[in-house]
Regions:
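Bacterial Sec-pathway N-terminal export signals of envelope proteins
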Residues: 1-21, 137-139, 189-219, 269-270, ...
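Sec/SRP-type N-terminal targeting helices
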Residues: 9-10, 26-27, 63-91, 141, ...
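Regular, well-ordered alpha-helical segments
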Residues: 20, 27, 85, 92, ...
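Small/polar, glycine/serine/threonine/aspartate-rich low-complexity segments that form flexible
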Residues: 36-60, 181-197, 203, 226, ...
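Transmembrane beta-barrel architecture of outer-membrane proteins
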Residues: 52-54, 100, 145, 259-261, ...
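Periplasmic alpha-helical coiled-coil/stalk elements that build and connect Gram-negative outer-membrane
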Residues: 69, 78, 85-200, 311, ...
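Acidic, low-complexity, intrinsically disordered peripheral segments
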Residues: 179, 192, 309, 363-392
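A glycine-biased, small/acidic residue-tolerant capping/turn segment at secondary-structure junctions
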Residues: 327-351, 376-391
Length: 392
């Protein structure tokens, strides 16, 4: 389902670009061959034209004594793996975001049902308080207060319905689909692992795509420094030409003869030595920056995992307390309604009890969502699922 997501497809294209760059760097270690055939016809003073041709094949190979090309290949290899980890990071983020949006829909459905049920009950309460007013047992102020509370809950119902629609649209957009109804279960039907790790070993953190990306970024910076240092040393290139030609200086020979030549070239930077040394300093500084970024990524990873574990544990411990709170508030609502019927309390106490119950019920649902969300966050913080990749 996620393969249609534009962010994931963009990340895949970046992997393909890095793979092509790596292939180019590998080919630079091999000799290059060039075929440059030439031919022409010439005549002098209306004499018979003479045909000359030259069919040379030229080979050129840089002897990588100081590992300039090898370091360039290794740098591009690290960049290739870095692009793979970026794609994995996008994939893991998409999975986590999709799960969070799905659980958000389940939470909103539950809150919508609670608010809708409460609105129906409060509509009956408004009718009852109006009847009591007609019987001289309640005041107009009591009717107005109950009506205002009912309208407030009805407004919440409308807002929750809007939030459900917007969340469905967000999930459809994430999946690169047109807006439609999302089939889903209830919040209570969602199941998560009962036991979670307390204390996370470093080996688990190393599975995170951002940690691995930072590691490959550091490797790339290291080889970039080595590549810049190699530019201080001479480049040695061997070249040779073999081919057939019938042009031997000022003479034309037929049939053509085999022509062989070989040459060597040594290129030593002199006037660019200062610029090359500056590039080495820049590369070293960038390598140190990559090291610091790697260390900070490790620290951030540990913090995110611990935060997710703490949030999940807190939500699970709070669940029982919310259950007790809701049960107590239900009894409070029943008691105050009964007392009001016998004239022992006022409508304000009943109204307060109902509002407190509604608030607690919504918070109870939100706490269940927080528990589910923290498990998803933990999945993301630990790197998510891994894909098996092989460098081409």
């Amino acid at each position: 389902v996620l393969v249609r997501n534009t962010d994931l497809r963009t990340a895949q294209l970046q992997v393909e670009e890095a793979e092509a760059t790596l292939r180019t760097a590998r080919l630079s270690l091999l000799p290059s061959f060039t075929l440059a055939p030439q031919g022409g016809v010439s005549s002098f003073d209306n004499s018979k034209g003479t045909w000359t041709y030259n069919l040379p094949v030229t080979a050129s190979w840089e002897i990588d004594i100081f590992s300039r090309l090898r370091n360039g290949k290794l740098r591009n290899k690290a960049l290739y793996y870095q692009s793979i980890e970026y794609r994995q990071a996008v994939r893991t983020q998409l999975i986590a975001t999709t799960a969070n949006l799905y659980f958000t829909l389940c939470m909103l459905d539950e809150q919508y049902a609670i608010a809708n049920e409460t609105a129906s009950a409060w509509r009956e309460a408004v009718d009852a308080i109006r009847a009591m007013k007609d019987a001289g047992m309640a005041t107009e102020a009591a009717v107005a207060q109950n009506e205002a509370a009912y309208y407030s809950v009805e407004t919440s119902v409308k807002q929750l319905a809007q939030s459900i629609s917007e969340t469905e649209n967000s999930l459809c957009s994430l999946l690169a689909q047109t807006p439609h109804k999302i089939e889903r279960g209830s919040l209570e039907s969602q199941r998560m692992p009962a036991d979670l790790l307390i204390g996370v070993p470093v080996q688990l953190l190393s599975r995170r795509p951002d940690v691995r990306r930072a590691e490959y970024s550091l490797m790339s910076a290291y080889y970039a420094t080595a590549e810049a240092r190699s530019a201080l040393y001479p480049q040695i290139t061997l070249s040779g030409t073999a081919g057939w030609t019938n042009s031997a200086g000022s003479q034309i020979v037929n049939p053509g003869k085999l022509l062989l030549s070989a040459a060597g070239q040594l290129l030593q930077p002199i006037f660019q030595a200062g610029a090359n040394r500056a590039r080495v300093k820049i590369a070293k500084a960038q390598q140190q920056e990559a090291m610091l970024a790697y260390e900070q990524t490790i620290l951030n990873a540990g913090q995110e995992v611990n935060d997710a574990l703490t949030a999940c544990q807190t939500a699970r411990e709070s669940a029982a307390l919310y259950d007790q709170q809701v049960a107590s508030l239900r009894r409070a609502v029943e008691s105050t309604e009964l007392l009001m019927q016998h004239g022992s309390t006022t409508y304000l106490e009943v109204l307060t009890a109902r509002q407190s119950l509604l608030s607690a019920q919504l918070q109870q649902v939100a706490n269940r969502f927080t528990e589910l969300q923290s498990v998803v966050t933990l999945y993301h913080a630990l790197g998510g699922g891994r894909e098996t990749e092989t460098a081409q």
